[in-house]
Swiss-Prot record:
Cell compartment(s), UniProt: Secreted
Signal peptide start and end residues: none
Protein name: Phylloseptin-J2
Residue numbers of Phenylalanine amide PTMs: 19
Length: 19
């Protein structure tokens, strides 16, 4: 589960960068 956290943060960062 912890290994998914960096991926989630990266996805959120990508979405935030898109907006």
């Amino acid at each position: 589960f912890l290994s998914l956290i960096p991926h989630a943060i990266n996805a959120i960062s990508a979405i935030a960068d898109h907006f």
